[in-house]
Amino acid sequence: MGSGKSTALEAFERLGALTLSADEVVHSLYEQQHVVDQLVDRWGAVVAPAGAVDRAALARLAFADEQQRAWLEGLIWPLVAAQVAAFREGSLVHTPRPPAAVVETPLLFEAGMEGIYDATIAVIANEELRRERAAGRGHEALDERNARQLSQQQKADRATYVVINDGTTAELEAELALILERLAE
């Protein structure tokens, strides 16, 4: 969180890549009735007052302990993986052919989804900058969320490419353009 994954995704789109945000996929899943029904069955109407998922309430309940989080991930991650697979298939027949199809997947390695991609990119940034960015977006609980994720170094060690995003958006986009050229080869 706060490393610049969403900014990187926007840059890839400007550079001509097809893009998909796994976060947006998750948000759309929370609007599907079969998902809402399962969430309400698990945690009660508090997670979906008036039929719409309250993501803050869901987060409080789902991340209260490991079993609750694992249950939610078991529900959501396979659905996300299916939509990512459909996106990938669509990208293969897209006209004109894009230089790459890029999926922003915040918990890529934690979800064990890295194997479905041809390459992975870890976008990392210094901790203080990440805190500033996260706070600017209303995400104050960076330490709590980070505790449930691999460290930036672990992600960098597992990624095909590593982008250090401590500079400007223009610098980030220039670095991503170089990666996009390599991916298009």
Question: What is each stretch, according to the model?
Answer:
Residues 23, 72, 102, 163, ...:
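Residue-level signal for inorganic ion chemistry
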Residues 13-22:
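Post-Walker A helix-loop "phosphate-sensing" segment adjacent to the P-loop in P-loop NTPases
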Residues 6:
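Walker A/P-loop
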Residues 85-135:
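ATP-dependent NMP and nucleoside kinases share a basic, alpha-helical "lid"
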Residues 3:
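ATP-binding Walker
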Residues 15, 36-40, 81, 127-135:
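An amphipathic alpha-helix signature
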Residues 83-84, 115-116, 127, 133-185:
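Small-molecule kinase domains that catalyze NTP-dependent phosphoryl transfer to phosphate-bearing small molecules
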Residues 24-100:
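ATP-dependent small-molecule kinase phosphotransfer cores
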